[in-house]
Amino acid sequence: MAAATASSPATAAAANSDDEDNYEEYIPVAKRRAMEADRLRRLRLSKPAPPSSSAAEAASDLPPPPPPPPNQPSAGGGGGGLEASAKPSLLVKATQLKRAAPEVTHTEQLIMQEKEMIEHLSDRKTLMSVRELAKGITYSDPLKTGWKPPLRLRRMPRAKADELRRKWHILVDGDDVPPPARDFRDLRLPEPMLRKLREKGIVQPTPIQVQGLPVVLSGRDMIGIAFTGSGKTLVFVLPLIMVALQEEMMMPIVPGEGPFGMIICPSRELAKQTYDVIEQFLVPLKEAGYPEIRPLLCIGGVDMRAQLDVVKKGVHIVVATPGRLKDLLAKKKMNLDNCRYLTLDEADRLVDLGFEDDIREVFDHFKAQRQTLLFSATMPKKIQNFAKSALVKPVIVNVGRAGAANLDVIQEVEYVKEDARIIYLLECLQKTPPPVLVFCENKADVDYIHEYLLLKGVEAVAIHGGKDQEERENAIEFFKNGKKDVLVATDVASKGLDFPDIQHVINYDMPAEIENYVHRIGRTGRCGKTGIATTFINKNQTETTLLDLKHLLKEAKQRIPPVLAELNDPLEDEETMAKESGVKGCAYCGGLGHRVTDCPKLEHQKSMAIAGSRRDYYGGGGYRGEI
């Protein structure tokens, strides 16, 4: 027992001596790096001298040799410390990877940043119904229609079709694009519709109609982009009438059924105008013995009972604003079981004005595949990417740059002080004979100018969102019929409304978004006529807005006033950026004076979203925020 007790201290001492033999001294990081540098220096000294300095530099950039195995001493001949230092650190590896990676220029960094922003902005829920999203339903082929172009168009060589598109300045993007049609007779429209076109003075199709009508008639989904006054309305109205006519002739509609096709507009005035265009073609068809086609104007501010009476009889075509349409569908007064044709007119404005959620709710009521068309004069890249999610093999037809100003409009920009605008407005009214359109940002300015003009004896009317529907309709009717000389309006009248005789548009103030400016001046210079647009600017406008205006004037080859020419322009030479990124100007709002990284519209929407989230978190007001 004593022997065993005596042996245990001896065993412990032997174990301690073994641990001391295997013990490796801890070497601090700084010392390991110094040892590594010393080892590399000795390696370089042991090699023969390089022939030139450039070769020495190249050799210094090479990675260090792999470390020796654990049981093999390092090149320095040291102990365990050098063995530990042979493995390169993460910092050394990162430096080597940075040296090996290709150098990225500042322009390439900006392009990558913009691309990430656009992908993030376009990464929204797709424009599909809840049923399609839930069941994972996707459509790979577009809808088939009974329409075919004439044989000579079907046999047209592709080279000739491309030559015609170049001649008409038409850009197309898509697979299996139908050939362009230079004559309305090639579209195989009924004779009463062709006769009505001739009565309206429309003899030859415009560029957007040359390519757009064959695309839509063949059943393809389409994004149509063309400057204001180019005839986009006929591109989706004529095929819609043909769809309704074909469905009625195959199987007549029964009470409570329909519609077969639908057009959604951002404003009541634009919806009413589109509805009137449809009726102009339906009247001669009915007189010629074709089946009756019943359209429905579905807008707010009008008694719903009259609209429900049309629905009960059975409706073929619906022209609507999102709010009233959503209301009818939610109350199950109308269904979209048979709807196969959908057009979003001024599609980018529908999204920007906050109708995106309403449109999604409308999409939820579709029961089958439909042909979807999107049209606008200003269609930024982010809207195009977002819209493609709802389309099946879409064809993009572009006449000119999206967001470009109409070249038939002479743009004049005047620097006018805030308090001198109303007096200078009277002088500008003398430039051209009536009718004249005056635009303002605020409803209060519209009412003020309207009263001032009436006091000066000018026959004027006014419209804005604060007036009831009857006042708005009467104002536009009096102005179109020539009973009133001047129409004062907010941007509610700037999108899509057609006033064919207007020679002069006056912007009492410069809109904050360049898209609204393009829509405003597009009310004149329509159908090939020349018009004048006068814009008042002053120190209240932001520099970004003025730079966008400057680039727009330069693109349209218009005179640039000295106050704009003197602005410091960071994008004066952005040709390289535009060529490498494929996007000219801002991809979010379409402005040419800034890039998407500096877009004021995007910043404004971000701040609005943050304010909305705070309001949701802290409550909507009332006592202690409970309301």
From Swiss-Prot:
* Bias type Low complexity, positions: 1-15, 52-61
- Tell me which UniProt keywords the record has, alphabetically: ATP-binding, Helicase, Hydrolase, Metal-binding, Nucleotide-binding, RNA-binding, Zinc, Zinc-finger
The record ties this protein, via SMART domains, to: DEXDc, HELICc, ZnF_C2HC
Q: Where along the chain is ATP bound?
A: A226, F227, T228, G229, S230, G231, K232, T233
Q: Which GO terms describe its biological process?
A: mRNA splicing, via spliceosome
**Region forming the signal peptide:** none
Q: Quick one: where's region Disordered? A: 1-23, 40-85
Chain ranges for the short sequence motif Q motif as given in the UniProt record = 182-210
What this protein is called in its record is DEAD-box ATP-dependent RNA helicase 35A
Native source species: Oryza sativa subsp. japonica
The uppermost taxa in this organism's lineage are: Eukaryota, Viridiplantae, Streptophyta, Embryophyta, Tracheophyta
